[in-house]
Amino acid sequence: MKLTVLGCNGPYPEAGGACSGYLLEAGDTRVLLDCGAGTLAALTARMAPEQLSAVVLSHLHYDHMSDMLPLIYRMQGKGKLPVYAPGTPAEMRGLLAGAFDLRDLEHAEHIGALTLSVLPVRHPVPCYAVRYTAEGKSFCYTGDTNTCEGLTAWARDCDLLLADACFTDAQWAENKPHLSARLAARMARDAGVRRLVLTHFTPGTDQHELLFQAREVYPQALLAHPGLELEF
């Protein structure tokens, strides 16, 4: 498998950056995971979007799906791209209806060479963590979540964990919609994952502090950045 980070900001992109978007490749299968602002340009620099096997949207917040709207124009006359997304919010899902082969993420099991395992997580709108497996390798993406029952077990022994790490210790609270870097690292350690990449950085947050706090728990933690490529 290969993961390419296209964007890693939220809820809006920093100068020169992009919101959540990741390209996962396994053999001939290519899946775009989330499609926030700036993601489409980064994707198009690497491949034609019509070469995608599917798009998987962890949830329907703008910073994870806004570039689906210009993608509608890019895909005109090129067939309906399969898009897996939660069923709600209905008004957000409705923006995609008709333009794509829209499918329920809740029931997704296979995309090409990839087998999917979906877990509902804790966020203000329905959001799903997804584990992708192919040829004995596994990749886990938390989507957006705070602490969540079952998340550590879901990520157990994966080869690469891409985890929401929006907050420093000082910023995090139990009632907020995202994990801290330290909590993401603790989950990675307890799950026995082989590699951890932190993502979903708010512009202006000290990413060095995020990495420092994560590495106190999981010393090999990495920060996502546009253009980062990892093979596993």
Where do the PLM segments sit?
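Short, solvent-exposed loop/turn segments at secondary-structure boundaries
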Residues: 16, 97-98, 172-177
